[in-house]
From Swiss-Prot:
Binds 1 zinc ion per subunit. It is an enzyme of class 6 (ligase). This is Isoleucine--tRNA ligase. InterPro entries: aa-tRNA-synth_I_CS, aa-tRNA-synth_Ia, Anticodon_Ile_BEm, Ile-tRNA-ligase, Ile-tRNA-ligase_type1, Ile-tRNA_ligase, M/V/L/I-tRNA-synth_anticd-bd, Rossmann-like_a/b/a_fold. It comes from Blochmanniella pennsylvanica (strain BPEN). NCBIfam families: ileS (TIGR00392). Catalyzes the attachment of isoleucine to tRNA(Ile). As IleRS can inadvertently accommodate and process structurally similar amino acids such as valine, to avoid such errors it has two additional distinct tRNA(Ile)-dependent editing activities. One activity is designated as 'pretransfer' editing and involves the hydrolysis of activated Val-AMP. The other activity is designated 'posttransfer' editing and involves deacylation of mischarged Val-tRNA(Ile). It is found in: Cytoplasm. HAMAP family: Ile_tRNA_synth_type1 (MF_02002). Monomer. A motif ('HIGH' region) lies at residues 58-68. It catalyses: tRNA(Ile) + L-isoleucine + ATP = L-isoleucyl-tRNA(Ile) + AMP + diphosphate. Keywords: Aminoacyl-tRNA synthetase, ATP-binding, Cytoplasm, Ligase, Metal-binding, Nucleotide-binding, Protein biosynthesis, Zinc. L-isoleucyl-5'-AMP binds at E564. The gene is ileS.
């Protein structure tokens, strides 16, 4: 028997079926960096329009986690697709280098600052520690396939950047937004420093909730207010609080001016005043079941009444406040100006003196109360409850009241509001808050709910506390008068001198400089240096001013896009917006894009205690970076991004489908030279023109979705193209023509031309996401080309179906619907054991005139499109008596299927009646003989 294998054009490629990404990707990376790929892209795109994605600097502290990977890969996808779109899209990665987390890590390594090591040495160790951490993170980011200027990143601890941060601060000062004030700020006892709002997280917390009585001093006035004789009675104004430790700082009691307050007699022995709307709630809480309402008045009438502190020997006034609420408590609030923003505002209104009785480590100072001297505030609650009991002021206590409470995000310990002298940026000076609200409307927020988020935060944001009591940070390099605390009159000029020193020697220069080194000798002894450092959010928030103008590749152009996690509305987006608006009057960005956080399949936050943490390093080690990148691109990152082993398995299946489609294309164009073998569109087989038309449609959709940052839609469309239009139809149908026709026939070269156009397009579609795989595919595509797909632009060789084509798009859709119905019948018949596959079948299509006319266009090639051994079209009326294997899924169509007649051709596997017609080729059909020794068959449609 003759072996006809050598007469077939069987697929061949060196492009492997198995990706083996964990092994192959590092080799690809080596080649990228050996060839200076990033620099090559910059050179190729140097004259193109700039697109600047400004990297929000991640904090330098340990190996990257999955959130880091999501952020960096999304940025890389955008920059690569922008390059394909014709932009020069450089990427300069950055790192946030100063601040408390670094100090804490260094303290763990060398011991406590000020005890085991002096500040100057400590700063030096911090700098070296940061450099080590950067190398760890850089290695991880590079392994992700992220292209960037990794040899020249920007660091907030670069000497020039530190100097420019100081210059940024000087602009804030010169524009009049900077001041020193004593205000309540979040204070962490372990940090011994103020915390930014973004450094505070709210956790479930148990506190003692207490109802406390303040005793009336002026019974006569109260009697007049309620029109009842209470002169000989004990009258109490009752407050409710979850912070008993703040009671020693009490300076007033507030009521709402417009609320109604009732005088209540309890068991005919006690008289209390509380909000009318909360009487029933309070009585139930204090377990009082017998009371009488004696009178009612407005909060306004209670103003300036005096009440005795429950366990300290001084009186406090009643004040009015719109902040008093009726959602809990008693409608009466005790005021401790040191420990609450609302309390502080009231204190300013009534000119109370702010007295701090708690030190930086959270202990009471001396002479507050004999039982509280030196006691830590959270440990004082039980002592204070005991004092209240002794004085008869405690009406009720709940020791396990659960509520949200601010915690230090670094130490995971509760914090307090503490009034301290700090440097602030005013949110309301020169109408800044309203300017910010106007500015945000000029920015595109993606998703658009981000605009509402940041708008709400701006409306409610207090003044920005810029100062920190730390060592490792950019200094606030000011000189203040020793007696008046006023800034030196030449502050701006002095800051420039200091910035020049820092530019040469780093922030250590500030601590090395003496006052007389900067200020003239005759006044040097009148001034002292400020030793506070800047909030690290000022460091990163000023990079649009301190970094962007310094990089030549940015051509002094402002950033187009900021892309970070949704937590950055109150972080980097906010700090950058404030600083930019203060200095330039404009937003620092044109677009802001946010992504959600990673969670497990059940929507739970990843944590070691739950055992659901998946690291990017694990994914890369087991599956490769392209799988991680594909999962990121496939996820709707505007929401929480779920990941699990099952989800990764699905991602791998998607990857295989894309890779196998690419491999099929490559395997069937291995002998194709696009310069010599391409077929002109007018001469191509119509199915091939349809395939190119579909690829063009997909490309337009893909580019549109890339432009909208809808990467999950990009992947879905590519997957649909590979699975449905290609895998389930085109690639299946062309196998007969590709394998059996003459090697150099127009029929085969037309098919190869289409596959070439498709792979040229597809490799670009996937390059921003599957960067390693796209690079591998690129090197296997025939024809002259540049070395890397990443220097290219979208493929322009695709075309639409021509008006000269007999089959238009509508006709093809009609055929595909018919084919789908035929496939259902084929599968049903196969399951019944009558046929083994579609080539075992012969079909008759009974169709109404319009449908029949469309199908008859295809003539005797119809069977090739249906992948059956024969197929004919008959008038619908002829099929009335047909019942076997009939399906009428399409109106006006009946299908009759039977086992094909004739013998099976050993070469093309079609059942034919002409097998054995040629003596020397007794086992193959006449068509195959023609393709082997004759001029070859001719096709027009399939």
């Amino acid at each position: 028997m003759i072996n006809y294998k050598n007469t077939l054009n069987l697929p061949y490629t060196l492009f492997p079926m198995r990706a083996n990404l964990p092994v192959c990707e590092p080799t690809i990376l080596e080649r990228w960096y050996k060839d200076n790929l990033y620099e090559a892209i910059r050179h190729k795109k140097s004259k193109k329009k700039l697109f600047i994605l400004h990297d929000g600097p991640p904090y330098v502290n340990g190996s990257i986690h999955l959130g880091h990977a999501v952020n960096k890969v999304l940025k890389d996808i955008i920059l690569k697709y922008k390059t394909l779109t014709g932009y020069n899209a450089p990427y300069i990665p950055g790192w946030d280098c100063h601040g408390l987390p670094i100090e804490l890590q260094v303290e763990r390594l060398i011991g406590q600052l000020g005890v085991n090591v002096d500040p100057n040495e400590f700063r030096s160790i911090c700098r070296n520690y940061v450099l080590d951490q950067i190398e760890i993170q850089k290695k991880d980011f590079v392994r992700l396939g992220v292209l960037g200027d990794w040899s020249r990143p920007y660091l907030t601890m670069d000497f020039k950047t530190e100097a420019n941060i100081i210059r940024t601060l000087s602009k804030v000062i010169s524009n009049g937004y900077f001041y020193k004030g004593t205000k309540p700020v979040h204070w962490c006892f372990q940090c011994c420093s103020v915390l930014a709002e973004s450094e505070v997280e709210y956790n479930n917390h148990c506190s003692p909730a207490i109802d406390v009585a303040f005793f009336a001093v002026d019974n006569i006035r109260i009697s007049k207010i309620f029109n009842i004789d209470l002169c000989q009675r004990v009258i109490e104004l009752v407050i409710w609080t979850t912070t008993p430790w703040t009671l020693p700082s009490n300076q007033a009691i507030s009521v709402h001016p417009d609320y109604s307050y009732q005088l209540i007699a309890i068991n005919n022995s006690k008289y209390i005043i509380i909000a009318a709307n909360l009487v029933n709630t309070v009585m139930q809480r204090i377990q009082c079941f017998s009371w009488r309402i004696l009178g009612e008045t407005s909060g306004n009438s209670l103003e300036s009444l005096k009440f005795r502190h429950p366990f300290m020997s001084f009186d406090v006034p009643v004040v009015l406040s719109g902040h008093v609420a009726l959602d809990s408590g008693t409608g009466v609030v005790h005021i401790a100006p040191n420990h609450g923003v609302d309390d502080y505002i009231i204190a300013r209104k009534y000119n109370f003196k702010i007295v701090n009785i708690i030190n930086e480590t959270g202990h009471y100072v001396s002479n507050v109360h004999p039982m509280l001297d030196g006691v830590q505030v959270f440990q004082s609650n039980e002592i204070i409850i005991k004092l209240l009991n002794q004085s008869g002021s405690l009406l009720h206590v709940n020791h396990n009241y659960k509520h949200n409470y601010p915690y230090c995000w670094r130490h995971a310990v509760p914090v307090i509001f503490k009034a301290t002298a700090q440097w602030f940026l005013s949110m309301d000076k020169y109408n800044l808050r309203n300017k910010l609200l106007q500015t945000i409307h000029q920015v595109d927020w993606i998703p658009n709910k981000g605009e509402y988020s940041i708008e709400t935060m701006i409306v409610n944001r207090p003044d920005w506390c810029l100062s920190r009591q730390r060592v490792w940070g950019v200094p606030i390099p000011l000189f203040i008068h020793k007696k008046t605390s006023i800034l030196h009159p030449r502050t701006i000029a002095l800051m420039e001198v200091i910035a020049q020193h820092v530019e040469q020697n780093g922030i250590q220069a500030w601590w090395d400089l003496k006052t007389e080194d900067i200020i003239d000798n005759e006044e040097a002894d009148q001034y002292e240096k400020v030793l506070d450092t800047l909030d690290v959010w000022f460091d990163s928030g000023s990079t649009h001013y301190s970094v962007i103008p310094e990089r030549l590749e940015y051509r002094k152009q402002s950033p187009d896009l900021y892309l970070e996690g949704s937590d950055q509305y109150r972080g980097w987006f906010m700090s950058s917006l404030i600083i930019s608006t203060v200095i330039t009057g404009q937003a620092p960005y044109r677009e802001v894009l946010t992504h959600g956080f990673t969670v497990d399949a059940q929507g739970r936050k990843m944590s070691k205690s739950l055992g659901n943490v998946i690291s990017p390093q694990e994914i890369i080690k087991d599956f490769g970076a392209d799988i991680l990148r594909l999962w990121i691109a496939s996820s709707d990152y505007s929401k929480e991004m779920a990941i699990s082993n099952a989800i990764l398995k699905h991602t791998i299946d998607v990857y295989r489908r894309i890779r196998n489609t690419a491999r099929f294309c490559l395997a069937n164009i291995s002998d194709f030279d696009p310069e010599k073998d391409s077929v002109h569109p007018e001469n191509m087989i119509e199915l091939d023109c349809w395939a190119i038309d579909r690829a063009l449609s997909v490309q337009l959709e893909v580019i549109s979705d890339y432009n909208k940052y809808n990467f999950h839609n990009v992947i879905q469309r590519i997957m649909q193209f590979c699975s449905v239009e290609m895998g389930s139809f085109y690639l299946d149908v062309i196998k007969d023509r590709q394998y059996t026709t003459k090697k150099n026939s127009k029929e085969r070269r037309s098919c190869q031309t289409a596959l070439y156009h498709i792979i040229e397009s597809m490799v670009r579609w996937i390059a921003p996401v599957l960067s390693f795989t796209a690079d591998e595919i690129w090197r296997h595509i025939p024809g002259n080309r540049s070395k890397y797909v990443f220097t290219e632009e979208w493929y322009n060789g695709l075309f639409s179906i021509s008006s000269k084509q007999i089959m238009n798009s509508h006709d093809w859709n009609t055929f595909l619907n018919v084919r789908s119905e035929v496939n259902k019948i084929v599968e049903q018949t196969r399951l019944n054991g009558i046929i083994g596959g579609s080539l075992d079948a012969s079909v008759v299509l009974y169709a109404t005139p319009e449908l029949a006319n469309t199908l008859r266009i295809l003539g005797n090639e119809l069977s090739f499109g249906l992948i059956t051994s024969s197929a004919i079209v008959s008038d619908y009326c002829n099929g009335f008596n047909v019942t076997q294997y009939t399906q009428e899924g399409i109106p006006g169509l009946k299908i009759f299927l039977e086992k094909a007649k004739g013998k099976k051709c050993l070469r093309c596997w079609h059942y034919r009646l002409d097998i054995g017609q040629y003596k020397n080729y007794s086992n193959i059909c006449a068509r195959c003989v023609n393709n082997i020794v004759g001029p070859g068959e001719k096709r027009r449609f399939f």
